From Swiss-Prot:
Composition skew (Pro residues), residue ranges: 414-428
Name of the protein described by the UniProt record: 50 kDa spicule matrix protein
Tissue expression from the record: Expressed specifically in the micromere/primary mesenchyme cells (PMC) lineage.
Keyword Ubl conjugation among UniProt keywords: no
Region entry Disordered, spans: 118-178, 210-445
UniProt organism field: Strongylocentrotus purpuratus (Purple sea urchin)
Length: 445
């Protein structure tokens, strides 16, 4: 809403070189210019909007303000201006007036509200009768107006309740009867009337315009010191915007040579992150460039990235990067890849899926010192296998025994030259010499 009001006010100030801005009406006294805005906004927003419209010509060096009423004639003139926009020539909307009860002695243009001012507050439970004044709805000039109202309120001008008269439908107000005022909360939504001091004609090229306007600050833009849409434009930052040093919220962030969002230099959260030579997300030099990555010191998607190629089989050792990974110092899925360990793998010191791959062990495998699925692979044992010291699925595979096999110390393989082979008739161990066991059984029988 503020952006819309800023654009409208800038166009008004730029549009004409006459003694009143475009679409403003000069008062009968010739001292002021008025314009009715049928936009419902809170009091403070209406006040800021009117301040952005500066006087035309070289008249009084004052900014615009919400309308200030200093006489019955001015009160009626503003009322008729607003009423002229309705079908029945009656005032339809309540409008803000430029007097805030938090500073009750002055109108917003700087003139005193009283004791020499004018007021037309109605007599109602919301605004009790003024001392010394009868409870009427007349519009007196009040040389000693003590009305200040509760804090956080401002006056609105509205038409008085029309009397019910036959033949007039109960809608007409007698000619010459002006509006009434009522103090309402400044957070309420009302239309408003702006007042600008009238000036003398000057060339259009000298008119104040968008180059010196702003919304809340004295230089153009929206909230920043030099914000806007030029060489140093932006929104909210010191020099942010969409230009040479554009950005949004950072010191020099943006989409240019050093672009970024929120970081000291371009990127997202890191010291040099971004999408450039050293871009990244969250790491010291992470990103998607020469040393890009996600979270690690050198991980990423570049010369040292760590991301498995989905087009390759999982057991191949060729990966996208030499030392890529996610989260570790040199983790990844390449020559020494891994996830979370000091060197590649998952949880172990040198675990992974390569020459010495593993999961969780000191060297590749699953739980053991040298477990894995290669020459000495295994799961859980010190050497490859599942549970035994040298179990696995290779030359010495086994499950659960000290040496490969299924439960025993030696595998059931008659071609195994190992002297502990239970099928070897020369086995000196009677417990595992099957021919000898059969002979002993026959002898006992």
């Amino acid at each position: 809403m503020k952006g819309v009001l800023f654009i409208v006010a800038s166009l008004i100030a730029f549009a004409t070189g006459q003694d009143c801005p475009a679409y403003y009406v000069r008062s009968q006294s010739g001292q002021s210019c008025y314009r009715y805005f049928n936009m419902r906004v809170p009091y403070r927003m209406a006040s800021e909007f009117c301040e952005m419209v500066t006087p035309c010509g070289n008249g009084p060096a004052k900014m615009g303000a919400l309308a200030s009423v200093s006489s019955p004639q001015e009160n009626m003139e503003i009322y008729q201006l607003v009423a002229g926009f309705s079908q029945d020539n009656q005032m339809e909307n309540e409008v803000w007036l430029g007097w805030n009860s938090q500073s009750p002695f002055f109108w917003e243009d700087g003139t005193p509200a009283y004791p020499n001012g004018f007021a037309a507050f109605s007599s109602s439970p919301a605004s009790p009768p003024r001392p010394g004044m009868p409870p009427t709805r007349s519009w007196p000039v009040n040389p000693q107006n003590p009305m200040s109202g509760p804090p956080g309120r401002a006056p609105v001008m509205k038409r008085q309740n029309p009397p019910v008269r036959p033949g007039q439908g109960g809608r007409q107000i007698p000619q010459g009867v002006g509006p009434q005022w009522e103090a309402v909360e400044v957070t309420a939504m009302r239309a408003f009337v702006c007042e600008v001091p009238a000036g003398r004609n000057i060339p259009i090229g000298q008119q104040p315009g968008m180059g010196q306007g702003g919304f809340g600050n004295q230089q153009p833009g929206m909230g920043g010191r030099q914000p806007g849409f030029g060489n140093q434009p932006g929104m909210g930052g010191r020099q942010p915007g969409f230009g040479n040093q554009p950005g949004m919220g950072g010191r020099q962030p943006g989409w240019g040579n050093q672009p970024g969002v929120g970081g000291r230099q371009p990127g997202m959260g890191g010291q040099q992150p971004g999408w450039g030579n050293q871009p990244g997300v969250g790491g010291r030099q992470p990103g998607m460039g020469g040393q890009p990555g996600v979270g690690g010191r050198q991980p990423g998607f570049g010369n040292q990235p760590g991301m498995v190629d989905n087009n390759q089989a999982w057991w191949t050792t060729t990966r996208l990067g030499n030392q890529p990974g996610v989260g570790g110092r040199q983790p990844g899925m390449g020559g020494q890849p891994g996830v979370g360990g000091r060197q590649p793998g998952v949880g172990g010191r040198q675990p992974g899926f390569g020459n010495q791959p593993g999961v969780g062990g000191r060297q590749p495998g699953m739980g053991g010192q040298q477990p894995g699925m290669g020459g000495q692979p295994g799961v859980g044992g010190r050497q490859p296998g599942m549970g035994g010291r040298q179990p696995g699925f290779g030359n010495q595979p086994g499950v659960g025994g000290r040496q490969p096999g299924m439960g025993g110390q030696q595998p059931n393989n008659p071609n195994n030259p190992n002297p502990n082979n239970p099928n070897n008739p020369n086995n000196p161990n009677p417990r595992f010499n099957r021919p000898r066991m059969l002979q002993e059984a026959d002898a006992l029988a």
